[in-house]
Amino acid sequence: MPRSLKKGPFVDEHLLSKVDAQNDKGTKQVIKTWSRRSTILPDFIGHTFAVHDGRKHVPVFIDDSMVGHKLGEFAPTKTFKGHVKDDKKGRR
């Protein structure tokens, strides 16, 4: 079930303050964050976030198609190695 519209999107305060500070200065440095649960706002467009995936920080460049999604959606936590080959034919 989606979040109520009267509450608005959730964004961690420290993340929003870092983006506002960079927008005021006019800089576009990488912002390191562990907040995968924060919603991407239109103010974030053009910034690069280093989102933690549990092991390392994955750089995520924000564009307009990402607005409304969560930061964690763009930093996968699991790597798929592929399925093991079935050797039933070779056992005969």
UniProtKB/Swiss-Prot annotation:
The keyword Nucleotide-binding does not apply. The keyword Repeat does not apply. Gene3D superfamilies: 30s Ribosomal Protein S19, Chain A. PANTHER family: RIBOSOMAL PROTEIN S19P FAMILY MEMBER, SMALL RIBOSOMAL SUBUNIT PROTEIN US19M. Belongs to the universal ribosomal protein uS19 family. HAMAP family: Ribosomal_uS19. Protein S19 forms a complex with S13 that binds strongly to the 16S ribosomal RNA. This is Small ribosomal subunit protein uS19. It comes from Corynebacterium kroppenstedtii (strain DSM 44385 / JCM 11950 / CIP 105744 / CCUG 35717). The gene is rpsS.
